[in-house]
């Protein structure tokens, strides 16, 4: 009888331990034990598999976690935030219900999200990724992958994409022709030489600064409100089909002319460091900031810009300027 009881006790003990999730990282375990809402519902200082399966949202932000072994037990989570940790690798292949995943500000050199088809929002920015496959993430709407080491990126299967932030990588080409729902595209500080935006009619903001563009066609993007093509090699740009532009940042290019005549709501125009000999802002009554320094401009008329608050025209040929009709001016930088 004693032998039977001992065997039964050992079996129960083994079964109980088998139901405890293996979590080798102390900081990860502490984060789970102190999580709000409570995960350790029986208060035994361990995380049982049954407790893990009851979790749907998991916040692990800034917990000094280096290893997320054990995350595979949380099979029902749809929301995982593990930003700002010390993760070198991460396996989310068992977390197939994820719709939100934020692994930004870690040390990841690889990330496999091919088994997470429900993802609508993915943030893997500020890591050390060299490749990333999002072909299976067909529901992706918001995608942050900036500040990595990516040399190529295929988003052709992410047709629902609205926001795409791929700046500060090493991309030499970028195809967004299948992303017809795209509204925000931030692709600055890469090595891009051209981009086809003909299919992106819903585009509202585009930043392609600090690339190697010599031309840019935005004629099919009538909803643009924010345009930044600064620090490229453009000698001209046609913005006649973009009447709703609020901000144009085109400094440090080779522009010899820019026509902003049909921009009634334009508030910011930064075109310093170009080859402009003149600039007409008489039809921009909402203009607040004008930077046109470092251009061979000889004269400047801002009499129609009564809301102007800041103007910079240093290193130009402007010898005098009438600012009597600009009562809100609080910043003026001109020639010495």
Residue ranges and their predicted role:
Residues 4-81, 96, 117, 136-138, ...:
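N-terminal capping/linker segments that flank leucine-rich repeat
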Residues 56-60, 80-82, 99-103, 120-124, ...:
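Conserved hydrophobic beta-strand positions in leucine-rich repeat
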Residues 68-71, 90, 111, 132, ...:
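Canonical leucine-rich repeat
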Residues 82-106, 115, 123-125:
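Right-handed parallel beta-helix
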Residues 93-94, 99, 110, 120, ...:
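Intrinsically disordered, low-complexity repeat tracts
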Residues 318-336:
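Leucine-rich solenoid repeat scaffolds
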């Amino acid at each position: 009888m004693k032998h039977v009881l001992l065997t039964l006790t050992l079996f129960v003990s083994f079964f109980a331990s088998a139901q405890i999730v293996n979590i080798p990282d102390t900081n990860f375990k502490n984060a789970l034990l102190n999580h709000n809402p409570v995960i350790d519902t029986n208060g035994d200082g361990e995380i049982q598999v049954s407790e893990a399966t009851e979790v749907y949202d998991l916040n692990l932000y800034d917990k000094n976690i280096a290893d997320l072994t054990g995350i595979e037990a949380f099979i029902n989570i749809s929301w995982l935030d593990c930003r700002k940790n010390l993760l070198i690798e991460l396996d989310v292949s068992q977390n197939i219900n994820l719709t939100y995943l934020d692994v930004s500000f870690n040390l990841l050199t690889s990330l496999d999200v091919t088994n997470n088809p429900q993802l609508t929002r993915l943030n893997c920015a500020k890591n050390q990724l060299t490749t990333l496959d999002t072909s299976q993430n067909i529901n992706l709407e918001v995608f942050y992958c900036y500040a990595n080491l990516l040399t190529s990126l295929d988003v052709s299967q992410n047709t629902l994409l609205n926001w795409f932030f791929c700046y500060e990588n090493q991309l030499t080409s970028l195809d967004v022709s299948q992303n017809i729902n795209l509204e925000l595209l931030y692709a600055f500080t890469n090595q891009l030489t051209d981009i086809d935006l003909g299919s992106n009619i819903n585009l509202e903001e585009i930043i392609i600064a600090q690339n190697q563009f010599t031309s840019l066609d935005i004629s099919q993007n009538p909803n643009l409100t924010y345009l930044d093509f600064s620090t490229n090699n453009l000698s001209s740009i046609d913005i006649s089909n973009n009447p709703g532009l609020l901000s144009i940042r085109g400094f440090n290019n080779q522009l010899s002319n820019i026509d902003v005549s049909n921009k009634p709501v334009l508030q910011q125009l930064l075109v310093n460091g170009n080859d402009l000999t003149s600039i007409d802002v008489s039809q921009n009554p909402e203009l607040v900031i004008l930077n046109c320094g470092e251009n061979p401009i000889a004269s400047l008329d801002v009499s129609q810009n009564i809301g102007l608050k800041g103007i910079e025209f240093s290193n130009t040929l402007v010898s005098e300027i009438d600012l009597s009709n600009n009562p809100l001016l609080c910043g003026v930088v001109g020639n010495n």
